[in-house]
Amino acid sequence: LIYSETGTLNMMDLAARLPEVADQRTTHTGFAFIMIGFALKLALFPLHLWLPNAYTYAPSAITVFLAATATKVAVYVMLRVLFTVFPQDFVSATPTDELFILSGMAGILITSVIAAYPANVKRLLAYSSVAQIGYMVLGIGLASATGVTASLVHLFSHALMKGARFMAV
C-alpha cells in the first residue's frame, strides 16, 4: 500500500515522499499494517502467543539465538521506521503512542503474573521476555528522547542477559 502511494520501498525515498501523501487513507492503512506486523514480530502483548511456544519447544541452542536477537531486531527496525521514515506529525496524529503505552503496560502486568506460574523454566523466561518487550515498547510510546534511549539500553541489556539465561537452562 505504501508502495502504491510513493512508488518506492527505499527508506530514504519514503521519508522524502511520505509527507506529500500523508493524508491519504491508503498511507494510514499501510502504516497500520506495518505496525501490526512489527507488533507480531516483537511478540507485543496481545500478539505474543507464538513466543512462549517457540522458546519452549525449540532446541536450547536455537532458543539462545532467538531470545537474543529475534524480537530485538524487530524493535530496532520499528524504531527506524517510526523515527526516520514516517513524518513525526503523521505518527503523532495516529494513536500509535497511546496503543504502545497501553499494550506495553498490559504486557508488563499480565505476562509478569503468567510468568510466575509455569513449571517449565524456558516458558517462564519466554513470558518474562514478553514483559520486557512491554517495557521497551512503553519507552517508545512515551515518544521522548529519554524513553527511546531507555528502550535502546534495555534492548541491548535484555539481549545479552536473556541469551545468557537461556544458555544456563
Predicted regions and their residues:
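Hydrophobic transmembrane alpha-helices and their helix-loop junctions in integral membrane proteins
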Residues: 1-169
